Amino acid sequence: MDGGYDQSGGASRYFHNLFRPELHHQLQPQPQLHPLPQPQPQPQPQQQNSDDESDSNKDPGSDPVTSGSTGKRPRGRPPGSKNKPKPPVIVTRDSPNVLRSHVLEVSSGADIVESVTTYARRRGRGVSILSGNGTVANVSLRQPATTAAHGANGGTGGVVALHGRFEILSLTGTVLPPPAPPGSGGLSIFLSGVQGQVIGGNVVAPLVASGPVILMAASFSNATFERLPLEDEGGEGGEGGEVGEGGGGEGGPPPATSSSPPSGAGQGQLRGNMSGYDQFAGDPHLLGWGAAAAAAPPRPAF
C-alpha cells in the first residue's frame, strides 16, 4: 500500500491478527471459562486498632449488648447503687420497764378478781386496772361502817354484801404476781343501783360478772416498793426495795429529791387504790349506807 506504513515484517503480522474476527472470538471466552480468583481485602492493622480504641471509649453501661459480647468488665460503681433505702431498725427485745396496754374481756358468770389474778400470775406481770364497764351481781364490799342500810345485809368486820344486779361506774386497782407483800394489791369499785344510788368500796372476792365486762388495763414487769415520806438528804438513808422484798432494808443511798414530803398518790396506786373511797365516807347519800354510816368513826390509815 502507498499509505505510509509497511505491511511487511512484524507490523504486518500484528495488523493482520487485529483484523481477523475468528481469532478474536476464540480468545474472548477464555477469561469467562477460567476466571481468576480475586484476592479478599485484608483488614489493615491500623484500622483495627482504631476500632478497638473507639469501642473502649464507649460507656459500658450504655450498650449492654456490646459489653456482654466483648466480655469486658465494666468499671466504676454500677448505676443505681447509691442512695439505696436502708432497712428499718427493729428492736425485738422489750425493755423491762415498758408498759403494755390490754383490753381484757371477762365472760359472764366468771369471777373478775380471780380472772385478773390468774392472768397476772401466768404472765408474770403486774396488772393495773384503769377502768371497767359492765354489770355485776351479788357484790361484797369492805366499808368503814359495820352496819348496812337500804336493803343490804350487813356483816361483821366491815364487809357488806349487796344482792342484786349493779352497773359498774368505775373499777380501778392493781394486781401483783407472787411474790408480793400482803396488802399491796386490790380493786376498788363504784356501782350504780337500780334506784340510782351510788355504792363504792374495796372489792371482796368473789366479784361475779352478770354480763360481759370490759377492762382497760396496763401491765408492767417490775415495781419498786418505797415507804413515804422520804427522809431528808442529811438524815438517815431512805427505805426502799423491790416489791418481792417486802419494803427493803435501811441504809440505802438517799434519793435526790426535795425535802418536802411527796403526796400519797404513789402509795394509793401501789396498794390498788384501796383508800380511794375514803373521801366519800362523810356523804351517806353517795355511799348509800344511811346516817349510821356517816356517824361511824373514820377508817384508820394503812
Curated annotation (Swiss-Prot):
Required for the binding to non-AHL interactors: annotated segments: 164-169
Residue ranges with Gly residues bias: 237-251
Highest taxon in the source lineage: Eukaryota
Protein localization: Nucleus
Gene3D superfamilies with a match to the protein in the record: Hypothetical protein, similar to alpha- acetolactate decarboxylase, domain 2
Tissues expressed in: Expressed in the hypocotyl and the vascular tissue of seedling.
GO biological process: flower development; photomorphogenesis; vegetative to reproductive phase transition of meristem
SUPFAM superfamilies, A to Z: AF0104/ALDC/Ptd012-like
Ranges for region Disordered: 1-95, 229-279
InterPro entries reported for this sequence: AHL15-29 (IPR014476), PPC_dom (IPR005175)
Entry keywords, A to Z: DNA-binding, Flowering, Nucleus, Transcription, Transcription regulation
Notes concerning its domains: The PPC domain mediates interactions between AHL proteins.
The protein's assembly and partners: Homodimer. Interacts with AHL5, AHL12, AHL25, AHL27, TCP4, TCP13 and EF114.
Role summary: Transcription factor that specifically binds AT-rich DNA sequences related to the nuclear matrix attachment regions (MARs). Acts redundantly with AHL18, AHL22 and AHL27 in the regulation of flowering and regulation of the hypocotyl elongation. Acts redundantly with AHL27/ESC to modulate hypocotyl growth inhibition in response to light.
Protein name per Swiss-Prot or TrEMBL: AT-hook motif nuclear-localized protein 29
Protein's organism: Arabidopsis thaliana (Mouse-ear cress)
